[in-house]
């Protein structure tokens, strides 16, 4: 199934996919230890750290292809990036290795994508650049989203991002007719119609062609 590997402010994302509601949000805020009320971690994680459960209560695997999956968020900025790469690589293995096609509770023959989220300030971290380069080399279905609000806490991006735009800085990663690479999109966060159209196109390319998309 599709997996998210994100950072610790994706409550809107999780609510949009139906994996978080208001009651669970406040249960996590007050560290509720009952997983019926706080399924992400039973109160063990900090606020804003989300995940979904891959196992049933009896320890058996859930069918991950029938649900929206999220790996557990962590606090170190850009720490989600190496895991994102691994999730995308797993999908490629499931597509290319016929011996794995029988594991239908995990993958539909590699028809999955790994969805990453990160803030623009954290793109200055080394783990971001290492992962982006590796995904381009490996050509894995990784859909990378950078939330660009212009600041990292209180530091404007002109002091931390070349050209003040991560998509501009990564233009050399754009694929062409002769060389493999990324498909890169840039869209205004306030333009909802354009967002829907861009994400539909980006996800379709990532899933069908099994290439990384920014």
Spell out what each predicted region is.
Residues 142-214:
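Thiamine diphosphate
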Residues 1-140, 145, 156-174, 179:
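Cofactor-binding active-site loop characterized by glycine-rich and histidine/acidic residues
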């Amino acid at each position: 199934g599709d997996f998210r590997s994100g950072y610790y402010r994706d409550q809107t994302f999780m609510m949009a996919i139906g994996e978080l509601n208001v009651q669970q949000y406040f249960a996590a805020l007050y560290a509720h230890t009952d997983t019926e009320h706080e399924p992400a971690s039973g109160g063990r994680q900090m606020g804003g750290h989300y995940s979904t459960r891959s196992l049933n209560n009896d320890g058996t695997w859930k069918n991950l292809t029938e649900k929206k999956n999220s790996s557990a968020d962590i606090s170190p900025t850009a720490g989600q990036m190496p895991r994102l790469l691994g999730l995308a690589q797993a999908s490629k293995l499931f597509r290319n290795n016929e011996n794995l096609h029988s594991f239908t509770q995990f993958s539909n023959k590699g028809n999955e994508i790994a969805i990453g989220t990160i803030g623009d300030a954290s793109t200055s971290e080394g783990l971001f650049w290492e992962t982006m380069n590796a995904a381009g080399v490996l050509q894995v279905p990784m859909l990378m989203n950078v939330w660009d609000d212009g600041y990292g806490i209180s530091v404007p991006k002109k002091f931390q991002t070349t050209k003040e735009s991560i998509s501009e800085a990564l233009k050399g990663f754009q694929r062409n007719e002769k060389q493999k690479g990324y498909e890169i999109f840039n869209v205004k966060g306030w333009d909802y119609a354009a967002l829907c159209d861009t994400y539909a196109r980006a996800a379709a390319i990532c899933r069908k062609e099994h290439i990384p998309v920014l």
